[in-house]
Regions:
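Structural alpha-helical scaffold elements that stabilize or flank donor/cofactor-binding regions
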Residues: 148-149, 217-218, 247
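Conserved phosphate-binding/catalytic region of the ribokinase-like
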Residues: 1-13, 177-181, 239-360
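Glycine-rich phosphate/adenosyl-contacting loop at the front of the ribokinase-like
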Residues: 1-85, 111-112
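Short, glycine/acidic-enriched loop or turn micro-motifs at the edges of active sites
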Residues: 20, 24, 68, 192, ...
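Intrinsically disordered, low-complexity terminal tails and inter-domain linkers enriched
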Residues: 7, 28-30, 130, 136-145, ...
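Conserved beta-alpha-beta core of the PfkB/ribokinase-like small-molecule kinase fold
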Residues: 155-243, 253, 261-263, 268-270
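Glycine-rich phosphate/pyrophosphate-binding beta-alpha loops
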Residues: 98, 160-164, 333, 339-342
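Conserved N-terminal subdomain of the carbohydrate kinase-like
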Residues: 59-158, 353-360
Length: 360
């Protein structure tokens, strides 16, 4: 019998956005495609990670704000069915749950194109999607709801999107302060999405100076920092995990994912097994890709699952143990790529183990 992740205090708290990814037809435009060619999938990076952890059997909580609408209710049902702790979820009766338009290439790669219903919220409160429920996360509600969850937690998993509006940025700061007071480490997946900051932004734009200034304090509080390769270039001018760690005062563990090119990481001087400061690298698994949406979130869920099971991985674990954890995380991401959407294809522990056995 599988254990219920919600039956114990969460080891990971995932804080941030829950939304719908509206996937356009492969090679088509989600803004103009007819409804029958669109594929709506529940998503949002922290919600994806929470669902992935629960699927693997790690006790986890999701903290976010949902619109009191059909999408929000569907999300609450899904999270509850997965066994995610929802005791700190907030509900918004004024703002809708966000729908993100996702353009897919014929090869399954995705590009974020803005938001459905953007005209309804444009011009209200400063940044792209500032009137959606996820951007109105309330610090006052967190002050009461979060401490009981932190009592048994090892990790607070966050992204940068809450910084895009004043209310959710304040709530994020509150969560970070509470986590620090409880000795809970921060896992930051930057998840840079320009259109969440400015609906008119180029989806491929790098962070500007003002945004970098706002991101820097967040980067400096991470114990574990996960970046896509293009995010690493945009934020640090390098894809080298060692160089990235050295540029931050706390010297975090750093993982840089690069799609089909694989993963590079640095968990300390012993990561490579050479005794010197150089990153370790693992090639990606070769799998048929249906949709890459959520692959990075599946990877992070797999890695946090391993870190909860073996807390010393980022400290003094031998290189082969660190590599095994990264390989497990890569398998989680590869399995997500073989289905549609970020959450539905997430694997159970037995499926990951079977995949690894089949890919020695």
């Amino acid at each position: 019998m599988e254990r219920d992740p919600a039956a114990a205090l969460p080891q990971v708290i995932c804080l941030g956005e829950a939304l719908v990814d509206r996937l356009g037809p492969p090679g088509g435009d989600p803004t103009t495609a007819p409804p029958e060619q669109l594929d709506d999938r529940l998503g949002g990076a922290p919600a994806n990670v929470a669902c992935g952890l629960a699927r693997l059997g790690t006790p986890v909580a999701f903290v976010g704000r949902l619109g009191r609408d059909a999408i929000g209710e569907a999300f609450a049902r899904l999270l509850a069915e997965r066994g995610v702790n929802l005791s700190a979820v907030q509900w918004d009766g004024e703002r809708p749950t966000r729908i993100v338009l996702v353009r897919r290439s014929a090869a399954g790669e995705r590009r974020f194109e803005g938001f459905a219903g953007e005209a309804l919220v444009a011009g209200h409160g400063g940044g792209g999607g500032a009137r959606f429920a996820d951007q109105a996360l309330a610090a006052r509600e967190l002050e009461m709801a979060l401490p009981p969850l932190l009592a048994g937690a090892r990790w607070l998993q966050i992204g940068s999107i809450p910084l895009a509006s004043a209310a959710s940025a304040q709530a994020l700061e509150q969560a970070l302060a509470l986590a620090q007071g409880c000795g809970v480490a921060v896992a930051l997946d930057v998840n840079w999405r320009p259109t969440f900051w400015d609906a008119a932004a180029d989806p491929d734009a790098a962070p500007g100076h003002v945004t970098l200034t706002r991101l820097r304090p967040l980067l400096e509080r991470a114990r574990l920092l996960k970046l896509a390769a293009e995010e690493a270039e945009g934020l640090f001018g390098s894809r080298d995990p060692v160089a990235i760690a050295a540029s931050l005062p706390q010297r975090p563990s750093v993982v840089v994912t690069d799609g089909a090119a694989g993963v590079a990481w640095w968990f300390g001087a012993g990561s490579s097994g050479s005794g010197v400061a150089c990153p370790a690298v693992l090639p990606a698994f070769e799998v048929p890709v249906v949709d890459s949406t959520g692959a990075g979130d599946g990877f992070l869920a797999g890695l946090l699952h391993c870190l909860c099971a073996e807390p010393a991985l980022l400290a003094d674990a031998p290189p082969w143990r660190q590599r095994a954890a990264i390989r497990f995380a890569c398998a989680c991401g590869a399995l997500v790529c073989q289905g549609s959407g970020a959450i539905d294809p997430q694997p159970r522990l037995a499926a990951v183990e079977a995949f690894l056995d089949a890919h020695p």
